[in-house]
Amino acid sequence: AKLIEEVGRLIIPFSVSAPALIAASAALDRTDFVEETYKNNFIEKRKLQNFFTRQGYFFYESQSNFIFVKLPFPDAGKKLEDKAILIRNLESFGFDKDTYRISIGNSNENNALINVLKSFK
């Protein structure tokens, strides 16, 4: 048990696989891809933040490709998973049990998320 605790301290919370690192390195060589991805993330993050604000959901400001948001209904992660939308619960990282990490997707993915969240009210 002690060894498992020690190993757990060394592992980063959102680890990245070797193939993902190789793909990311190759993507960085394509400046057009990087610029398009940056633009998409900026636009789509604003769309999600505006939606969360209108719905009264608390979220943490983000400078990355994800948002931490408190979703005000029980079992939000499971309900979204049932609709083929995966989000990560952040309770094990010290946040409230209703706080989730939502990655910024493309316009269609984010619209699907918004539509499903609207249906939960």
Sequence positions of predicted segments:
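PLP-dependent enzyme catalytic core of the Aspartate aminotransferase-like
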Residues: 82-83, 92-121
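PLP-dependent aminotransferase class I/II
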Residues: 1-52, 57-58
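Conserved PLP-binding catalytic core of the aspartate aminotransferase-like
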Residues: 42, 46, 50-83
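Short beta-strand/turn micro-motifs at beta-sheet edges
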Residues: 13, 87-91
